[in-house]
Amino acid sequence: SGDGSGKPKGIIKETPADGQAIESAAPGYADLIAAEAALPLAYENDAVWCMSKKTFMQYYGLVDETGQPLGRVNYGLAGKPERFLLGRPVVVCDYLPSFTSAISTGEVFAFLFNFKDYILNTNYAMGLKKYEDNATDDIVTKAIMIVDGKVVDKNSLVVIKKSA
């Protein structure tokens, strides 16, 4: 979620392509359908949903007109939850706000994206410094690395924002 000034530019700070920003007053089935429709066919293969766990649970609790749940949680071979919405994997993270009435109008709370379209640029040189802090007797390890990053193809990005 960085703004690109002194830190990598975050995915949700990128301006999506025309027609790829969906506005929603509350999580609903129509949001998911509109976002899926806005994702160009050429970018569909590796795109995943990204949202907070609380937002996922709001979508997960929705049912279609026949009473079938929209979300699916399966337990893979390792016993870890595997989350899906409309057949597409969901990555849950704490870096996006959960949908509540408290989030600001225009704030992104979920998005579809192919993470291969984000590039982290680095010189692969990490400086390590280890020293003892004499005031606290703690051993401190400090690592410094020069990195930058940004979305290189925003056509796979579809955001869902809170509407007024």
Question: What is the predicted function of each stretch?
Answer:
Residues 10, 24, 47-50, 59, ...:
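Extracytoplasmic/periplasmic cell wall- or extracellular glycan-interacting regions that localize
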Residues 37-42, 79-83:
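Short, conserved, surface-exposed binding loops centered on an aromatic residue
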